[in-house]
Amino acid sequence: MKIQKVWLIAVALGILVGSGGCQRKPEKTRIAMVVKNLGNGFFNAAHIGADEAAKQLGNVEVIYTGPTTPSAEGQIEIINSLISQKVDAIVISANDPNALVPIAKKAMLRGIKVVSFDSGIAPEGRQMQLNPSNAELIGEKQIQMAADAIGGAGEIAILSASAQATNQNIWIGVMKTLLEKPEYAKIKLVATVYGDDQSDKSYREAIGLLRSHPELKAIIAPTTVGIVAASKAVADEHLVGKVYVTGLGLPSEMAGHVKSGAVKEFAIWNPIDLGYAATYAAGQFITGRAEAKPGATVSLGRLGTVTLDANREAALGAPYTYNANNVDKFAKLF
């Protein structure tokens, strides 16, 4: 009799526990987006795309974070915290491709998927790298815009982000190679400086270029922070119409500079799409629908699919050109 009572109590408890479990909502999948630095308009737009992907994936929470100033040390500290929080994936634009490898490996060993986008982590530190575009196309576009602005002849300079930024260094390498071609023989690259993607430092570096090179005709800034700073510097030095700025910028931040004449045209991919695609890809790795191996196909939701190359990298597409004819339209979007 005693045994029967114990058995009945156990069954009753099992029913209660079971019914409680049925009512419990499944835990949300957490994808952390770690950007180069907070307060950067490009990454704010990428965050919008990440949230869109989260809604489509379903039951996904996006944790948007990054250091206040762009540094590998700041990102390492953040990733350590995310590992402790046991997030499901980290989507990151890296401030240094190699310095982040050990902490990224630690995350992957804990079962966290790592997808780098925009500026990549070295292959051993992530499942996938999503490039916004093809490096050759990006470099070529910026040289072409600068050449058109100055009539194919004159001195130009480059204002980049940090000296360790993977993407900018690759693009600059492409630009330097292109400048060796006969069609650009009359264009001379006189300096490459770094503003570390900080507005004040980028502005100071741009002022330095303008004052050190009185014959300068154009500044190429392959960074959304740098192009704004350089445009302001040209205006403040009363050089609009004498020195032109081009590079990669956000329409919402560049519309005024296009209207002022400091910028004839600039280019950028859609950061909303980039953030969306990177987050959607992370979701595929979390659920096992994508494999981190060369030749694997990864779904990017509304943007279709991409195939990973030998380094497990893929690209979205060519950058788009913005000028006085279309900048206002796109400024309303990002």
Identify the residue ranges that each predicted region occupies.
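Short, solvent-exposed amphipathic alpha-helices that sit
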Residues: 42-56, 138-142, 166-186, 201, ...
